[in-house]
Amino acid sequence: VIWNCSQDKDVPGIVSLPMHFKNNNYQTISLGKVYNNFGDGKGSWIKNWRPATTTTNWDYQSEESIRVFEERNEEWLKDPGIHDNNNLPKRGPAYESPDVPDITYEDGRIANRAIEELQHFQDSREPFFLAVGFKKPHLPFNAPRKYWDMYDKKDIQLPSNYFFPKDAPGAARLNWDELRFFAGMPSAGPLPDTTAINIIHGYYACVSYVDAQIGLVLNALETLGLAQNTIVILWGDHGWFLGEHGFWTKQSNLEKGPHAPLIVKVPWKSGGLQTKALVEFVDIYPTLCELAGLSAPVHLQGKSFAPLLDNPDQPWKEAIFYRAGTGETILTGTHAYTEWINPGTGQPSARMLYDHRVDPEENVNVADRPEHKKLIKSLQEQLHQHVKTRDNFFIP
């Protein structure tokens, strides 16, 4: 997946996950941030809703945050430069903690709307596909004060690996512009320690805030008598750095960036199981098809992980793949190998290898050590074959 791609523009006519369920007589509803580009996936939804911000972009609520946002946005509007990805609209603070009710922020309103839709389905008894796209814990880390108060700042520490990996190439560096765009953040260099602790605190608060909203929706499923016939998948669209390797935000080939949470609840299967099997986002589509008893479209590249719900320890994928920028990574049960290819020569211009058995935090790049030459050749062949197959994939 390329950042900020569009389904309608890049793969027009493709049968998306919600469209497939819609074609099979499910009522498909999108609430909140489901597609990155609102309005994308035309024909997939019978309803497509996002809450309007009540104050400014980013839904700031404190008077100070609103003032800072408006002043910076006015500066940007007067900027004669080109308004592109390198000159995005100025943003307000990276975090705030006003004493407001949960519903004041967008995620509270998204949860409320989801409950309303579930109440409708209790009455109609129609099969439904409800996508609830909560925004947190994306930046800015804005959450009601009570969620900040759940954590004592004195207990929050910087990560033990608050440094760039030893022997890693410059291509692996992350400038975390997404955070630098916010008010008060340095345009270059590391965060002051006090600011770094506040950012971590804000992330924790937002996780607890969105956890409460998810709980409201799940409680409604139970109360309305829908839980015993509803499959629930909770997943995030990416991981997040909280100072590991000196990084913040995401968009890195180091594993903290792409590693996302995934929890599945199927009423007729045992709960409480965990697996170390490797799965990918593309596996969710065929998994839901299998669990719902639908045939899977032929264009899918993923593999249903439904069997793991019964036997989480069975042999599974030997490797999965992800990319960030021009970096391509293969992840196995023991190693992560990344290459950046020089387009002129077709050869790697930089590479990384991490042995997760002894270095799960990816602190030491061992790609140039001679004892790993044979392993790298094998991983490289698998990675190149994957990229070739992916880029030449034909969608019927």
Predicted regions and their residues:
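Formylglycine-dependent sulfatase
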Residues: 1-352, 356, 360-396
